[in-house]
Curated annotation (Swiss-Prot):
Name of the gene: Slc35a5
GO cellular component: Golgi membrane
Major site of localization recorded for this protein: Golgi
Superkingdom: Eukaryota
Subcellular location(s) of the protein: Golgi apparatus membrane
Intervals, Cytoplasmic compartment: 1-21, 87-106, 156-158, 263-276, 338-343, 389-437
Descriptive protein name: UDP-sugar transporter protein SLC35A5
PANTHER family on file: NUCLEOTIDE-SUGAR TRANSMEMBRANE TRANSPORTER
Protein species of origin: Mus musculus
Topological domain ranges for the Lumenal compartment: 43-65, 130-132, 180-241, 298-316, 365-367
Taxonomic path: Eukaryota, Metazoa, Chordata, Craniata, Vertebrata
Disordered, as annotated region: 412-437
Keyword RNA-binding: no
SUPFAM superfamilies: Multidrug resistance efflux transporter EmrE
A GO molecular-function annotation: antiporter activity
Presence of the UniProt keyword Lipoprotein in the record: no
Amino acid sequence: MKVIFLRQLKTRGMERKCSRRPGLGPPTLYTFLLGIIFITLSSSRILLVKYSANEENKYDYLPTTVNVCSELMKLILCILVSLCVIKKEDHQSRHLRCTSWKEFSSFMKWSIPAFLYFLDNLIVFYVLSYLQPAMAVIFSNFSIITTALLFRIVLKRHLNWIQWASLLILFLSIVALTASTKTSQHELAGHGFHHDAFFTPSNSCLHFRRDCSLRDNCTSKEWTFSEVQWNTTARVFSHIRLGLGHVLIIVQCFISSMANIYNEKILKEGTQLTESIFIQNSKLYFFGIVFNGLTLVLQSSNRDQIQNCGFFYGHNAFSVVLIFVTAFQGLSVAFILKFLDNMFHVLMAQVTTVIITTVSVLVFDFRPSLDFFLEAPSVLLSIFIYNASKPQNLECAPKQERIRHLSGSLWERSSGDGEELERLTKLKSDDSDDDTL
């Protein structure tokens, strides 16, 4: 009798919980604000990258210098906040030590997403050299396909047949859009802007730039292909007009998906779930500075330009603002992966697609063809079908994750709408010190 009474009591409690409508509580408000911040920063970043280019749709500055400065800003900010957290809770200082093999291997794990983010942040500059911003953000929806494939292959996440069908429609729509896309730097030249340099070049810099111009722009030589060479390489894809811009953005989608999935995994696995996000990001941004710094030092063209012209040569007002926007946009992504999940990050990117497309029509003289108006809605419709067909949870009350934020209190949030989060945060009983690396 007592067992029956307890079951009835539990059932009634579940019914009351299911019938309760979610209000605009603090977690919902934080989610809304975080989404708005991410959309604003992501849209601004794409526009600033485009505005910072010159008349030839190339960059007078070294794009790696933007990434180095933004990583340094994020590292300084996270270290300062981490010191406050450690001072407030002394027991967390152990996360900054590397006195054992386990701690060292745990620290080195952050180098993997840092390297992937390093590539992702660098490729975006060259994607916008070959594609209009509107086309770039639409093609970036290919990351939904790469994320789904990585979830299925790496994390064994299951998709229903409607989701697979929507991904197929998305893939075909993106392929169809390549038929009406300009992917040559020469075709997009003239969409850039004339900038006044912040620093007057020295005599040695003028001689260096003159020699570089004779060698056909040595600054970007390692990141660009000649039109003849690329057209010969891509001749087999001529029936779909596959260009270098398309290849770069497909590679970027794979890299960004892998980076976000792995970063979310180590942000939430085991005891990392309750560790301060600022301590975790300090490790990530340390490796980000290392990889970007090595690029400046090891690339002979980059090293020669810095030696002759200085670190900030070629920068303009837009590139300086871009440093700050890139830094805060990276922090917003970290907060999304820590407190929400990858799917929220992908969904917010769709709003960015609409904003950038609208701005491109108004500012960048982007004139969509009839094919664009027929195929672009198919991309957005397939994304809507993919997210609308996500299976509902069997249990009404989803699992609650408790995550520690800066104030030291615990913020509870739901993880019921993402199967990948449950898999990422599942603890393994057979973990050992040897397999942490």
